[in-house]
């Protein structure tokens, strides 16, 4: 038998239950008190549940989303065996939430939000620029109550009302720089416009398709931040100046951009080979300093944003619906969840930077999350000053560092019988995750001239069947079955078909199964599969 004695350092008196274990070092008592004072939410008289305790209870509520109010409180006080603490009812804890409101939690998040890593930390910068990204998420569900429905509305593909969450993320650490959320019907670019004040001239912002509107590009350009984003397939960009690396200078609205038309061929460990096309626009117009192939490789960092959302929705929340039945409670809970997420990322980055040369993405979010839960239950590490070196969470992170990131690929799936996506295009990506052994990037130069398309389609009702339009087009596609054709290219090739007719007929033939639609405006003779091409 062996006796183990340990000491616990917490706040005195009625404030003892107000802690978050080792995360208290990231969100100290002084910061919480200052935020409460600034937002005028500090208690006027000292009760059994002071306002500071309420803030830590809100954060613990997100740290333990699987249990109710009373069990969350029990976890906060489990390590305080010899300390007299209150024993509130669930109603008392609900009343505590209402007294606080969402304002102090949002103010606390605003203090913690921002870039976390040094510019020299691996994976954080591209040349002199810190890489960040915009992206939205509309899959966070809230309780199906009348008040929530009045605020968020209904959706045809979800049983619960959902929030639209727009974030600006530091891709190297997945830390949050800024967040807005609300009803899903407002649109991603509208929400993203509210975060533009956070961009700085030393930042390079990445985004997916849908953010290339003229007004949004002009607003981003006005911040003097650089950008690299994907263009929609129907966006037409004039060729102003051809560059040596195959890209070209163009203009979108009033913004001067450089357009990169890249084709990426991926070879996987099992021999699977597939090709994808990316059309990017960037404000980095110097092709010698920023080659097109390097920017195309950099664009892959945008997917770090998806990992941030995975940590929020699945690692912390495990896909659960939020607790709150009214809009004010939903806002308060979301800001608490985001604050907790940022605190965990802060410890992860500090732990990675304590070992020079360590990429922050080697630190496991699940390790940090579970270690933080353990520390709360034990009330351990509350007074830890140097949590990166001396803290238990940091030690667990460094002991369980993930291997250096390797390139992998798999298809995107919606594992739900009720999906907002009408169909899944087979683009050749494997159904299971595979390692990538080679990545070949080729930059397509723009054509010398855009051929003029006819204004009228030729009537082919009175020609031989072998000379009719459908036969000729199918024969053209069969010459190179894996080539991706655009309607304009086919119309220009034959010269006797209008673009409108070409779009209409290709769509009908794809519905009939004669050809295959690979993506928006992309057609091929055969479907792309994971089988290596002969």
What are the functions of these language-model segments?
Residues 497-508:
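Short amphipathic alpha-helical interaction segments
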Residues 63, 478-483:
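Short helix-capping/hinge SLiMs at alpha-helix to coil transitions
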Residues 466-470, 520-534:
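Short, cationic-aromatic polyanion-contact patches
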Residues 483-493:
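Short acidic, hydrophobic short linear motifs in intrinsically disordered regions
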Residues 57-58, 470-478:
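Hydrophobic residues on short alpha-helical segments
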Residues 1-71, 97-100, 107-108, 127-128, ...:
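Single, function-defining residue in the core of a domain
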Residues 510-520:
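A short, conserved structural fragment
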Residues 95, 99, 508, 512:
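Alpha-helical DNA-recognition elements
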């Amino acid at each position: 038998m062996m006796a183990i004695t340990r000491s616990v350092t917490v706040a005195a008196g009625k404030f003892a239950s107000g802690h978050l274990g080792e995360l208290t070092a990231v969100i100290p008592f002084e910061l919480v008190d200052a935020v409460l004072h600034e937002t005028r939410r500090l208690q006027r008289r000292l009760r059994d549940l002071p306002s500071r305790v309420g803030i830590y209870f809100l954060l613990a509520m997100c740290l333990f989303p699987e249990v109710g109010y009373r069990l969350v409180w029990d976890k906060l006080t489990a390590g305080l065996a010899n300390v007299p603490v209150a024993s509130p009812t669930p109603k008392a804890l609900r009343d505590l939430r209402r007294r606080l409101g969402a304002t102090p939690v949002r103010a606390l998040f605003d203090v913690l939000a921002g870039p976390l890593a040094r510019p020299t930390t691996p994976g954080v910068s591209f040349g002199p620029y810190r890489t960040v990204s915009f992206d939205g998420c509309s899959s966070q569900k809230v309780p199906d109550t009348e008040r929530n429905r009045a605020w968020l509305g209904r959706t045809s593909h979800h049983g619960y009302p959902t929030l639209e969450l727009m974030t600006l993320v530091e891709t190297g650490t997945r830390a949050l720089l800024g967040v807005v959320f609300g009803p899903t019907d407002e649109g991603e670019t509208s929400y993203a416009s509210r975060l533009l004040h956070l961009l700085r001239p030393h930042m390079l912002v990445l985004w997916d398709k849908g953010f290339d509107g003229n007004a949004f590009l002009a607003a981003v350009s006005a911040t003097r931040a650089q950008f690299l984003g994907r263009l929609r397939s129907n966006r037409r960009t004039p060729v102003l100046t051809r560059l040596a690396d195959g890209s070209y200078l163009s203009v979108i609205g009033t913004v001067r951009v450089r357009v990169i038309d890249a084709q990426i061929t991926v070879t996987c460990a099992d021999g699977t080979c597939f090709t994808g096309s990316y059309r990017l626009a960037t404000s980095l117009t110097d092709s010698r300093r920023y080659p097109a192939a390097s920017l195309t490789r950099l664009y892959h960092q945008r997917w770090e944003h998806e990992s941030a959302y995975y940590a929020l929705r699945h690692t912390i929340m495990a896909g659960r619906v939020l607790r709150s039945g009214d809009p004010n409670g939903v806002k308060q809970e979301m800001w608490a969840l985001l604050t907790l997420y940022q605190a965990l990322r802060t410890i992860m980055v500090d732990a990675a930077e304590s070992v020079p040369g360590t990429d922050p993405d080697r630190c496991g979010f699940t390790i940090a999350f579970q270690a933080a839960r353990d520390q709360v239950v034990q009330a351990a590490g509350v007074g830890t000053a140097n949590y990166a070196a001396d803290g238990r969470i940091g030690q667990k992170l460094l002991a369980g560092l993930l291997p250096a990131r390797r390139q992998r690929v798999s298809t995107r799936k919606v594992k739900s019988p009720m999906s907002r996506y009408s169909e899944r295009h087979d683009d050749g990506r494997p159904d299971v995750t595979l390692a990538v052994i080679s990545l070949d990037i080729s930059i397509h130069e723009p054509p010398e001239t855009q051929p003029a398309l006819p204004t009228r389609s030729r009537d082919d009702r009175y020609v031989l069947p072998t000379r009719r339009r459908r036969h000729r087009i199918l024969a053209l596609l069969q010459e190179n079955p894996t080539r991706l054709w655009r309607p304009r290219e086919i119309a220009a090739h034959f010269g006797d078909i209008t673009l409108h007719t070409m779009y209409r007929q290709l769509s009908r033939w794809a519905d009939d199964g004669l050809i295959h639609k690979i993506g928006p405006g992309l057609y091929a003779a055969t479907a792309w599969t994971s089988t290596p091409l002969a």
